[in-house]
Amino acid sequence: MVSHKVLEFGDDGYKLPAQARAPRSLRKKRIYEKKIPGDDKMCAIDLLATVAGSLLLESKSPVNACLVVQNTVKNEYPADENPVKAVPYSESPSLFDNGKCGFSSVITNPNHLLVGDKVGKEVEGFSSLGVSGDVKPDVVASIGSNSSTEVGACGNGSPNESRDDVNLFSRNDDDENFSGYIRTRMTRPVPRIGDRRIRKILASRHWKGGSKNNTDAKPWYCSKRSYYLHHHQRSYPIKKRKYFDSVYDSNSDDYRLQGKTHKGSRTISSMKSRNASFVSRDHHVKLRIKSFRVPELFVEIPETATVGSLKRMVMEAVTTILGDGLRVGLMVQGKKVRDDGKTLLQTGISEENNHLDSLGFSLEPSLETTPQPLLSSYLSDHACDDVTLCHDNALDSSHEPEPSPADSFGKLGTSDHSRALIPVASAAMLAPRPPNRKFKRTEQQLAAQRRIRRPFSVTEVEALVQAVEKLGTGRWRDVKVRAFEDADHRTYVDLKDKWKTLVHTARISPQQRRGEPVPQELLDRVLKAHAYWSQHLMHQLQTEPPSTQVEAL
């Protein structure tokens, strides 16, 4: 069951209207000030400052000046039709707000009297009326055009201020037809006349203003921007209010500057935003190169040679490799940078990068210095129209060492069965070289050359299949001696791997094959030879004794 409670204030039993509550996060973070014992007592210096301020305002504006407005009081209750009077500000600090002269009104029941305009009578009236500080009559009154009301004229006349928990309001668009006040709280709190209350009043600009007219005194939120920030931050928790305060402090100067210089402030603010978003990249990268990587050198010298001859030979080898041009190579984190048009920042080299030790430099011979027209002139001098390749001698030429450019050109030009194509390797060999360069092919260079991956040609595959058909799959050294004796770049391990690749290629579909195409006739021969020698090996293992099988394994 739900219990309905009726709140009665006064004699009429008026119900408290529903009010919107603040968010739960805001209610949790609300800070309640502890009541300091003795805080209600006013200090002597604070009381003196309050009295001095009130006297200053009273001397500037007549206290007894009253403005009579021909209006009518329309009460919400039809039985109560009593006029309402507003008395001037009195010097009693316990009944009204301290430090300001404003409106003060008392709304009573029909059996009560109104307050007089003298200070003594006012105090007596309040004591005789017996209005308690905890309960007030709940009255909402609007001032119409049928009653006369006396309104005090002291103070700045601000319509939006509140006195004694009564919010006075008015409409600027229709002042003659409507004005009034609204009660928001039913209980009067204990008046705060201690240090904190007085300090807030003394810190306002009303006390610091030096103008003689009260209308010149403007509140601190006269600016639209600061007024918006002041009222907008009330709906946020206390932690977030610090952000609004910092925004107001940082933007106040810019806003005042914008009010004085209209176009200039826009330029300055735009320059500020650009400078905030733009970060200069004029930083320099500092590198320290300890040593260069030189191409590998192979020097062969007898033991009886002198140190000077060794130095001269090394110098000749360096001159031979580098030649007449040098080139610096750059490697970043193990990857060679080939594009010279990239910036250091795009490559990953910057001042903020802590991996500068991963940079590598190397001295390389500048092969690009060789002009391309020399190749065409070399070919035109020998009157060569078609450079051909011989199919019959392809295997024999691969067995021989690398010939000189002139010999290779002569052999290529005297072939009957030819193709009008120039391989890339042949074009590199045909390039002219300096006459003073010495070529010494050592065993180390030949061993390094053998490790270069060179795919098998169709002729080599045919020779391999023919040798395996005669010798079998378990005698790869004999296959090497029989078919590839002069091919130094082909080892018996290469032949064994190639045979396994051929068997796998022959078993898969043509759509799945990769690399250089092999005729289907050769692939069929590979399958037949592989099946024959596999059965022969199994039959041999079954007929031989176990001791022989162990020795064979």
From Swiss-Prot:
DNA-binding region ranges: 476-503
One Gene Ontology molecular-function label: telomeric DNA binding
Disruption phenotype: No visible phenotype, probably due to redundancy.
Main location class: nucleus
GO annotations of cellular component type: nucleus
Chain intervals for the UniProt region annotation (Disordered): 147-170, 394-413
Annotated keywords: DNA-binding, Nucleus, Transcription, Transcription regulation
Ranges for domain HTH myb-type: 448-507
CDD domains, A to Z: SANT_TRF (cd11660), Ubl_ubiquitin_like (cd17039)
Tissue specificity of this protein: Expressed ubiquitously. Highest expression in flowers and leaves.
Pfam assignment, any one: Ubiquitin_TPR1
Cellular compartment(s): Nucleus
Domain of life of the native organism: Eukaryota
Span of domain Ubiquitin-like: 285-364
Comment, domains: The Myb-extension domain (509-540) is necessary and sufficient for telomere binding.
Functional description taken from the UniProt entry: Binds specifically to the plant telomeric double-stranded DNA sequences. At least 2 repeats of telomeric sequences are required for binding. Induces DNA bending.
Subunit text: Homodimer and heterodimer with TRP1. Interacts with SNL1.
Annotated protein name in UniProt: Telomere repeat-binding protein 2
Gene from which this protein is expressed: TRP2
